[in-house]
Curated annotation (Swiss-Prot):
Pfam families: PsbM. The keyword Iron does not apply. The keyword Protease does not apply. One of the components of the core complex of photosystem II (PSII). PSII is a light-driven water:plastoquinone oxidoreductase that uses light energy to abstract electrons from H(2)O, generating O(2) and a proton gradient subsequently used for ATP formation. It consists of a core antenna complex that captures photons, and an electron transfer chain that converts photonic excitation into a charge separation. This subunit is found at the monomer-monomer interface. Belongs to the PsbM family. This is Photosystem II reaction center protein M. It comes from the Eukaryota. It comes from Angiopteris evecta.
Length: 34
């Protein structure tokens, strides 16, 4: 099976970017609540 590096990077970014965005929002909300 051939590994497509661009597809792997695109998938990683597609998963990591929303996760990081939600994580930042969660941290900001938690900081404001405290």
């Amino acid at each position: 099976m051939e590994v497509n590096i661009l597809a792997f990077i695109a998938t990683a970014l597609f998963i990591l970017i929303p996760t990081a965005f939600l994580l930042i929002l969660y941290v900001q909300t938690a900081a404001q609540n405290n």
